[in-house]
Design a protein with these regions (language model features):
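Residue-level signal for the nucleotide or nucleotide-sugar donor/cofactor binding architecture
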Residues: 20-24, 89-92, 119
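A short SAM/SAH-binding and catalytic strip from SAM-dependent methyltransferases
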Residues: 11-25, 48
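C-terminal alpha-helical "lid/dimerization" subdomain adjacent to the S-adenosyl-L-methionine
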Residues: 45-104, 110
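A short acidic, Gly/Pro-enriched loop at the edge of an enzyme's catalytic core
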Residues: 1-13
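Residue-level signature of catalytic and energy-coupling elements of molecular machines
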Residues: 18, 66, 124
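A short glycine-rich, Lys/Arg-flanked "PGG" loop and its adjoining helix->strand segment in the class I
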Residues: 26-41
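C-terminal lobe and adjacent flexible extensions of AdoMet/dcAdoMet transferase-like proteins
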Residues: 99-129
Length: 129
């Protein structure tokens, strides 16, 4: 992955609902760090794993029953929703994503669960050289 921008071109980079769809997320994070200026920001919004076991179980039932039903009613592409559910299940939990962000060019990594952990926002800062 080579973004067609010079080093330090941007004050911030954001990605929503997309990092889990990139074949090599670690490479993408490094490339994002390259194009952001020192002390620039990273914000990731992505599906995640609810930390509560009870809520996680309830959400799993929702994914297996409600989401496919809604997909059949709202879309002509059932496979897209099958992919969505499977990609969410395979995506690492919050702490692992935070470690991946920190290991690939970012400091001050924080995250905040949204909607009980169904989604999560990770934030980070590019360190000074």
């Amino acid at each position: 992955m080579d973004l067609d921008f010079e080093d330090g071109s941007f004050d911030a980079v954001t990605i929503s609902w997309g990092l889990r769809n990139i074949p090599d997320p670690a490479l993408a994070l490094r490339e994002m760090a390259r194009v952001v200026r020192p002390r620039g920001r990273l914000v990731i919004l992505e599906f995640s794993t609810p930390p509560s076991r009870a809520f996680r179980s309830l959400y799993s039932v929702y994914q297996k029953t409600v989401m496919p039903t809604m997909a059949r009613l709202a879309s002509t592409n059932d496979g897209a929703y099958d992919y969505l559910v499977e990609s969410i299940r395979q995506w690492p939990a919050q702490e692992e994503i935070a470690r991946m962000v920190a290991a690939n060019g970012w400091d001050e990594v924080e995250y905040r669960n949204l909607t009980g952990g169904i989604a999560c926002m990770h934030r980070a800062v590019k360190p000074l050289p």
